Amino acid sequence: MMTLNFATQVRQMKAIAGQPDYALGSVHAVTREGTLFIASASGSQLASYAWGAANVIFVVGAQKLVPTRDAARERIFQHSLKLEDARALVAYGQHSSIGKILEIDREQPGRTHIVLIQQTVGF
């Protein structure tokens, strides 16, 4: 993908990025029932998580476990966004925002794997 020109080949870049064999990432919250919540400013990573990738692996810190969907949304807006906003301001000189939130309730058997760790990872 690095050899493609963003100005003239953005469609090809999106096609490649949206259909990888594997997607590795994290989530912002996991409910007691197992619903995964992933927030994004642009949504660029969400397509592969939701459908495009053949296999998805999420590494999730135990601090992201919450009891309910409402608690997951509250965690995203009151915790994750605040930390990401501060990081983006230093890194890019601009504020962050949440443009999209993906909720995953059910998945094809064997497609998505969660690695739950005790270490604090991400926001």
Which role does the model predict for each range below?
Residues 17-123:
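Conserved phosphate- and dinucleotide-binding cores of soluble alpha/beta proteins
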